[in-house]
Amino acid sequence: MSRYKSEQTAYSPLKKKYVPMWQLDTNIMTVTHFNADTQIEESKTYTADFIRYHLHFSDSHCPDRLRRLVNEGRIIQYLDDMERKVSEAIPRQVGLWKQTDSCYQKAVLSGDVKKILGLGNCFVFMAREVVFECMVYI
């Protein structure tokens, strides 16, 4: 995959050269920011599988969007928002299905724990598929 670097640079006395203010490495899902005020390089690594899927998808289908987000210094905000929204959307969808699915409700009423857990897991995987299609692979 790719490594994106911002056009804006700052001098790093530690490295004794100009370094990009922002960098994104889609392989290791890490954003690096060189803070010119403190002269410190700060990194944030993402671990969610859907962030990896989104970065790899975006890298191959719309690299200009990633390049723009890195250049504008908005890549961390963008990925944090995606992480939060996807993490909230999956359980919200699962909850909706649990409220409306008659098989699940019958299992709850009868106390069939095996069926409750099985349907709950099924709902999670179904929700991931739907949410990923709508929010990750765009």
Task: Please identify what each model-predicted range represents.
Residues M1, T45-A48, C103-A107:
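General structural signal for secondary-structure boundaries
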Residues M1-S2, I28-A36, N121, E129:
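Long, non-globular targeting/processing and low-complexity regions
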Residues S2-V19:
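Ligand/cofactor pocket segment of small-molecule handling proteins
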Residues Y18-R74:
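Short N-terminal mixed-charge amphipathic segments
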Residues H54-G111:
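Aromatic-anchored, charged helix-turn/loop surface patch used as a conserved interaction hotspot
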Residues Q99-I138:
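C-terminal charged interaction modules
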